[in-house]
């Protein structure tokens, strides 16, 4: 029942009867980007109220004036305590928070991909059963390719993400429920009451008023410049600057510069620079006031009138407010007396100012930083062994990501550090699916992973057993979609030093100039099939010992001009069937002492003593005919397959595009004239 002031406070908790509690006093703190906090001091005729009927149950506080509802606050009971008991009344204390508070009870690590900020916020709210929320967004918010919640509560993540995107939120109340509203511009504010400035001691009957208003200006950063880097446009600065308004009372040289700006594209960079400036200057022009209007709440503006300083008679928006109410009649046994009173204190900024939370403040915690490198597993779609994009990036599954499915959707494309990386030269070794990698994070940012190392584990073992082969340095690959491997191995054990090369199929070597081999001991070559060699100029071979050749089939030798052989001692040739020597003009056999031609028991011998013919019958110009030989039937060698020069990778950008990337000009696809170098632009 209202007292002489006309004020009354009532409370309803869960399914308990409405007369279970009476309100002795309350304190309500509200602010943009913060869950409200309502503390209630209650009294009840029941000394044994069931805690289960109160805790985590809905609670609604109503503020009445002359029987008319002025304000309601609905939330969830987070704390309940029983105090002193008397003959008639027992005291209780309640703490009431919004449903959004439940997000503070769950800490998580997870990855969101290719989703807009409002979509991410909706997912988190719905997972906690919150469906009464709204987005009053004026600006476009780009999809986040990769957004990580890392070892932070859902509420901290919501506050941080909203602040990064320049959003703020507040609560609206209806009978038995409350709504969370996310906005990104002051235009989303609702228009509240008109409050006059009470110079005298006018009462509440004359309407709600402001009884104190302190105006303040503060020197804050004058402008913001953010800069970032993208490997896709390495020469482009990605720098964006925004200058503040209302700088007439301070210098304009207080620049806030930061790198990285946490963006990769110009539209986001422009927006983030403006968000940062708004946040840094969110109290450059502000006020602190006191009033008796219970209807005031964050997310609302009001009009101030009748202030002696006419410049203050304008619209203001409330960014935080503390309500206090006392109803001493509720404490009958303690002799509670005095009128029911209510007042509030609140902070304001101009209604035209878009208030944004400052990163690092209670309303917007800093992004968690990863304390060091982490382990991850390379993943990809089913049936693939190697999965990458045109930049050699891979997908990863982090051990802490409970939502990932160890497939090509588990992460964004993650860059991989290589031992050397230049303009179409360097090293390239793609981590394969199932490999364990070491992941670092640029600036400790969980949104910017990069693979910086590789490690073996219990199932991915080294190529050779250790420590038995600890002196071996090995580079071994594995055949893709098959069995086999290529290997380059170095053995450093003293007395066993070795360089070993294994190719599962082919070996191709291309030397653009000279190749020199110096083998100080033996060389052994074993070719299981054919060996084909072509020398386009001269071939010189010097054997300082003996040379042995064994050919188990035919041997063909073709010399296009002359063949010269010089033997220091003997020339001994043995044929199993036939020796056929044929010359186009002449055959000359010359010996220093003797030439003998022998067939069976017959022979011709020519020496210094004369010519000797021996045989059963000697025929001169009579009988018989000459025999013919088999003739030359040799085969020409086949040409080697050869080794082709690998083609250079296609140049991804034309000179015109490269020049554009080095400037601040917008970047677009090239036209056909650009490809031919004839574009006027």
Curated annotation (Swiss-Prot):
Signal peptide: none annotated. This is Type VI secretion system spike protein VgrG1. Part of the type VI secretion system specialized secretion system, which delivers several virulence factors in both prokaryotic and eukaryotic cells during infection. Acts directly as an secreted effector with an actin ADP-ribosyltransferase activity that disrupts the host actin cytoskeleton, leading to a decrease in host cell viability and an increase in apoptosis. Transmembrane segments: none annotated. Disulfide bonds: none annotated. It is an enzyme of class 2 (transferase). It comes from Aeromonas hydrophila. One of its GO terms (molecular function) is NAD+-protein-arginine ADP-ribosyltransferase activity. Pfam families: Gp5_trimer_C (PF22178), Phage_base_V (PF04717), Phage_GPD (PF05954).
